[in-house]
Amino acid sequence: MRKAPLLRFTLASLALACSQAFAAPSPYSGMIVFGDSLSDAGQFGGVRFTNLDANGNYAPVSPMILGGQLGVNPTELGPSTSPLNPVLGLPDGNNWAVGGYTTQQILDSITSTSETVIPPGRPGAGQVLREKPGYLANGLRADPNALYYLTGGGNDFLQGLVNSPADAAAAGARLAASAQALQQGGARYIMVWLLPDLGQTPNFSGTPQQTPLSLLSGVFNQSLLSQLGQIDAEIIPLNVPMLLSEALASPSQFGLATGQNLVGTCSSGEGCVENPVYGINGTTPDPTKLLFNDLVHPTIAGQQLIADYAYSILSAPWELTLLPEMAHTSLRAHQDELRNQWQTPWQAVGSGKPLSPAAPRTWISTARAGASGDGRGYNLTVGGSYRLNDAWRLGLAGGVYRQKLEAGGHDSDYTLNSYLASAFAQYRQDRWWADAALTAGHLDYSDLKRTFALGVNDRSEKGDTDGEAWAISGRLGYNLAADSSNWQLAPFISADYARVKVDGYDEKSGRSTALGFDDQARTSRRLGLGLQGSVQVLPSTRLFAEVAQEHEFEDDRQDVTMHLTSLPANDFTLTGYTPHTAPDPGEPGGKP
């Protein structure tokens, strides 16, 4: 019987209690845009409906910014029907939005004909500069792995097509029809703006039309949301009116000017009152301090806010689907600590023996495919065993595990406390040995803080939730050397099954950026081969080491169903984390 104190180094699970892996920064194959001037990338000879920068170039619109954040090729984000493209030999892009488009023209650009036509109120109004078949014309199909981005509705109001609640509801339904057409053509992920409050724009603020237009904007959005909820696709609504109202209520938090009329003034002075301080001819020209460039279009500040808002929603699953993985990491760390304890010498038959209290502390950093994070973990394991006879030893163990994970580019912070209990059995006869454990526990996600960029500052949304975990694991091995030998070498096979469930929760702020998440469940089924060895290095010291290779059979992509807490009836499911089939040492597994 071995009675020497033990030193054990397990290569297969080093730092397992704190490591994490990250999903790719974009699961989308591309980005295709439809809409009006709010998203127009330059159909009219490169003109965009936002401010000029310091070099005299047009600032990007929100889908161009979002596409860059998602890693989409800039060429693909360009205009689809610009008359300059064929003249200059430039390829058409995937942005089909055209300034002046009504909801009917947006639908036509998808299903029949895309026209770059001079909008009403402009010189040459009605002249078609270029036309081409619509995106899905001639039987073409949408890309189910691409992100589709849809804006529209404002021009139905500006061009006099909406004069009553019935007109507003019909316009909202027409915009939803564009999303429906994309879904029927094969699109799966469709992001749709809610119409901004037209009463809160320089064009109508302070006029008799302000209140009626605010009410009609709301009717439009109610109709739009109702119709979107009936489409069999992942429809991602953007609550743009709520976001902009937050910016107007607390401008300094968004980098906007304080003490200025952000609704009644604009940057360019084109048709509206130019801001005397930050307008283009003001004392300190700076479009980033203003929300509007002209009567109805946002500056780069507004475009950036909306792009960041959209990205915060799309990127949330890449972090939140790691919550079950944190629990699986705790389970594996607990199982490894049990195996560590099982290397201690067996006590006499009919007697008990406490486990050696263990409280390791570890750190690890990872960086994958543009996402990075740092994890750290602490745990405490206690318990004891009882030897039934020469061949069997039984025991109980409990463990408390605390993990903190910082994820993403803005250091989101997630904390998990795991409370695990195990019953285990060990067997040895001649040179054969085996062990098995059944584990169950409670998961306390006490502090979940998702942090993301929103304009010039970061914003955090907080929540908490609970969960449960259980697992069964076993090993069977054979010692190649006699028990009395100074060295041991034992090949083994292993099998593990674990299941984690994380309860759904809502982030608590009630703001436009707050999200709600449904329950998540993640199962792990692993088989492994390994080699365990030990050597007596000193009379009182034996060194243990282990190497193992496992295969994960549950390697499907992890998705999460979510919703904006401000729009709870419109949920959608987005892509998150994908486990490795063969976890790296020190990781629960993850591949970009």
Swiss-Prot record:
Protein family according to the UniProt entry: Belongs to the 'GDSL' lipolytic enzyme family.
PROSITE patterns with a match to the protein in the record: AUTOTRANSPORTER, LIPASE_GDSL_SER
NCBIfam families cross-referenced by the UniProt entry: autotrans_barl
GO biological process: lipid metabolic process
GO CC terms: outer membrane
Pfam families the record matches: Autotransporter, Lipase_GDSL
Signal sequence, start to end: 1-23
Active site: S37 (nucleophile), D294, H297
UniProt keyword terms in alphabetical order: Signal
Gene3D superfamilies: Autotransporter beta-domain (2.40.128.130), SGNH hydrolase (3.40.50.1110)
GO MF term set: lipase activity
UniProt protein name: Uncharacterized protein in trpE-trpG intergenic region
Annotated stretches, region: Disordered: 572-592
Ligase is among the record's keywords: no
Domain named Autotransporter: residues: 334-592
